[in-house]
């Protein structure tokens, strides 16, 4: 995997190109991610870069985590995340260093991961994109229901994983191949074309695309 950044979704707006075209963009605020630990194959069995992202008051950090931040010489963050990377990438960073929005360039394609909007309890039609039943002609009170979920006497049970009504949304979601329209290093902002998962203020992970369009 490649190195990415963790930021916060600010919201959506639009910008105009030099030709006057309106482009919808999502604004992400990416406070510089601080390197808290470098893991190598010799010491940890794998290579990865551990970073702290966001900001949090020191009074809200437990002693163990506060000591971890102090050892790295970085300010307290809202959380910690690891990016599995190669030895070549590790060589470019040191503990206590920063990774800024300049990791990305305008025009680059990225994958954005966040927690999708929660939509509460939903039926099987909406939740799993089932087809509705007939509106009339013999259908009585079975218009928008999933139908039978049962089996015969053998096996006599409902198999695990059966798609049923339940909570919709609030799950980890990735949108691939989104284009970075603008990088504002002065204000720590990324402007990404289109929509990204999650609500305003939600954490998102931005990585270089793994399925780059030909």
UniProtKB/Swiss-Prot annotation:
Stored Gene3D superfamilies: 3.30.160.810, Translation factors (2.40.30.10)
UniProt keyword annotations, A-Z: Methylation, Ribonucleoprotein, Ribosomal protein, RNA-binding, rRNA-binding
One function term, GO molecular function aspect: structural constituent of ribosome
Alphabetized PROSITE patterns for the sequence: RIBOSOMAL_L3 (PS00474)
Key word S-adenosyl-L-methionine present: no
Residues where N5-methylglutamine is found: 153
Family the UniProt entry places it in: Belongs to the universal ribosomal protein uL3 family.
Quaternary structure note: Part of the 50S ribosomal subunit. Forms a cluster with proteins L14 and L19.
Descriptive protein name: Large ribosomal subunit protein uL3
Species whose genome carries this gene: Methylobacillus flagellatus (strain ATCC 51484 / DSM 6875 / VKM B-1610 / KT)
Lineage: Bacteria, Pseudomonadati, Pseudomonadota, Betaproteobacteria, Nitrosomonadales
